[in-house]
Amino acid sequence: MNTEQLKQAFLDVFGQEADATFFSPGRINLIGEHTDYNGGHVFPAAITLGTYGAARKRDDQVLRFYSANFEELGIIEVDLNNLVFDKADNWTNYAKGVLKFLKEAGHVIDTGMEVFVYGNIPNGSGLSSSASLELLIGIIAEELYGLELTRLDLVKIGKQTENHFIGVNSGIMDQFAIGMGADNRAIYLDTNSLEYELVPLDLGDHVIVIMNTNKRRELADSKYNERRAECEKAVEELNAVLNIQTLGELDEWTFDQYSYLIKDENRIKRARHAVLENQRTLQARKALEEGDLATFGRLVNASHVSLEHDYEVTGLELDTLAHTAWEQEGVLGARMTGAGFGGCGIAIVHKDKVEAFKENVGKTYTEVVGYAPSFYVAEIAGGSRVLSRK
């Protein structure tokens, strides 16, 4: 959707011109899965699929939201002074949460607004449509009300919304990748200190293919919070001898030495994934910087194996995509990305082999799962931004 289409769509819905238009990307994560809430490193990148917005300030206390993705819901009206979670308000709860926490942080949002939203991130795909929406609302509020915010402020508000308004105990990676993204750069982020580096994503003759299982995953209703609790319990058990805050502080040798302290086989597996995935992420960044794409690809594969066997968050659909991808010509590596339990995988594929890859993986997946996957070539692009002003 281009800027003119956005402006026209806003005019069609609300009968007035928008003050500004906006875009907030989705994200993929190259490696470093389920490490963000374990104090480890992640390596995400913002993509050109995302959420578009157009907005206009009102002079009363009414918020009016419309999504082209949920046309059947029509315009949802919300009282600016009653920003509480209400299931009936559907997707606008994300917007309400962001505005609530902005206000609580002392930012003056004294009138309502009208917001048109259109997203081309497949819903429930694990490409962070919710974090994309949170950051979109954040930059809309920043622009319309002249708020003085750093981008990190908005990233933290997005995470706060996810954790304390929506009720998902997620880490900061998604919002960070979406807020801080840059063209052709991946973000190497230490989720403990929030120190980060923009690393050039030079894959030579290879491209990143997003593989969508087309099996929707619901993060809040999944085993995501259970995995987090298992890791927190493992830290507690390790601290009978050690003194750590998170699993991300350990290397594999220290973990092996003290894993006997963890009293449950499943918790040992969960913790082992968190520790080793963090180490893989450190190695992957080094490999990428040295142009060693073969090693980078092997680490990506190893990440999936660990998520499948130790963290157990993949399932038939994601495993079929990854395992089939590994067998294809021109593939450096493939794995699930995001929280798992459905959603998407990524594959690093030679650009001349992309069509054959899609055909072969699609055919096998359809035979095994019973319906077709979708494929998109990911372009790595900048973070949430204003597209145009009136």
Curated annotation (Swiss-Prot):
Catalysed reactions, semicolon-separated: alpha-D-galactose + ATP = alpha-D-galactose 1-phosphate + ADP + H(+)
Entry protein name: Galactokinase
Site location (Transition state stabilizer): 27
Pathway field: Carbohydrate metabolism; galactose metabolism
Organism: Streptococcus suis (strain 05ZYH33)
InterPro entries with a match to the protein in the record: Galactokinase, Galactokinase_bac, Galactokinase_CS, GalKase_N, GHMP_kinase_C_dom, GHMP_kinase_C_sf, GHMP_kinase_N_dom, GHMP_knse_ATP-bd_CS
Binding residues annotated for ATP, in chain numbering: 67, 124-130
Function description: Catalyzes the transfer of the gamma-phosphate of ATP to D-galactose to form alpha-D-galactose-1-phosphate (Gal-1-P).
Gene it is expressed from: galK
GO biological process: galactose metabolic process
HAMAP family reported for this sequence: Galactokinase
Gene3D superfamilies: 3.30.230.10, GHMP kinase, C-terminal domain
Signal peptide: none
Cellular localization per UniProt: Cytoplasm
Keywords annotated in UniProt: ATP-binding, Carbohydrate metabolism, Cytoplasm, Galactose metabolism, Kinase, Magnesium, Metal-binding, Nucleotide-binding, Transferase
Residues the record lists as binding substrate: 33-36, 224
GO molecular function, one term: ATP binding
PANTHER family: GALACTOKINASE-RELATED, MEVALONATE KINASE/GALACTOKINASE
Annotated Gene Ontology cellular component terms: cytosol
EC number: 2.7.1.6
Record-annotated active site: 174
Pfam families for the chain: GalKase_gal_bdg, GHMP_kinases_C, GHMP_kinases_N
